[in-house]
Amino acid sequence: GYHRAAGEPHAEIECLADARAKGIDPRGATMAVTLEPCNHHGKTPPCSEALIEAGIARVVFGLRDPNPLAAGGLERLRQAGIDVTGPVLEQECRDLIADFLVWQTEQRPYVILKLASTLDGRISTRNRQRQQISNAASHHNVHLLRAGIGHCGGAVLIGGGTFRADNPALTARTVPTDRQPLACILTSRLPQPTADFQLLRDRPQDTIFFVSPAACASTVAHALGEKGVRVFSVGPGINGRPDFPALFKLLRQDLGCPYILCEGGGK
């Protein structure tokens, strides 16, 4: 069993349902879980109570739940007489649910870097002309990744240079998807609303610009907003560079974005 989406049954509930659907009585069984079973009423009932009611005899867990609101499941299981073993394979479990741990402990999106480079570390020719480095299989994998991120409500992030030089669509095109990722551009210069960019023409409602406070208050930003494009202010951080922690916080907490796929250039 696995947790398919927020608000859906957790992995433990899915596992119990799968066993019963196959005619297997879980009573007296051992259940191995990556994360401590939750112990609170949120979008779903507590998994700890479901395991107790199912008659599970032993639970082997990998990690304690970092969310204090959901923690406490292990103690509840022990109180009910269930044998609890763990933590086990902690690093492997951390790697398996690295995105979830980032959401819970840092309240930001999980950031993925997409990078194609030559063996000597180059990403373009000497005169900065575009040169294909990746093969067809790599291109297909990028579209798979975009499709998955889009399905979850995630975003692709690029800089203004990539936006202006490549005029990208930032969509999943070679694989079926029910939802395209958001297109986020971090730039010092907003485009004119009438400029012929794919994102402005075809996907204005999915396009978000992150700019300085002054640019965010400009007439260009207002005109883009009338087209459905969103423009947000991101102030300077360390050494005058964009404040990425603030950007990530905005994406996660205000826009609900769980993943960011970074596809920008060298800068």
Task: List each language-model region with its residue ranges.
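Amphipathic coiled-coil/heptad-repeat helices and related helical stalk/stem segments
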Residues: 12, 43-47, 70, 138, ...
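Residues that form or flank phosphate/diphosphate-binding pockets in enzymes
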Residues: 10, 41-42, 68-72, 95, ...
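Proteins enriched for Cys/Gly/acidic motifs involved in redox and nucleic-acid/cofactor modification
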Residues: 74, 88-116
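Zn2+-dependent cytidine deaminase-like catalytic core
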Residues: 1-92, 182, 213
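Gly/Thr-rich phosphate-binding loop signature of adenosyl cofactor/nucleotide-binding cores
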Residues: 262
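Active-site ligand-binding patch in enzyme domains
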Residues: 102, 108, 112-258
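Short Gly/Pro-enriched loop/turn and capping motifs at secondary-structure junctions
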Residues: 191, 266-267
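Flexible loop residues that form catalytic
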Residues: 64, 161, 265
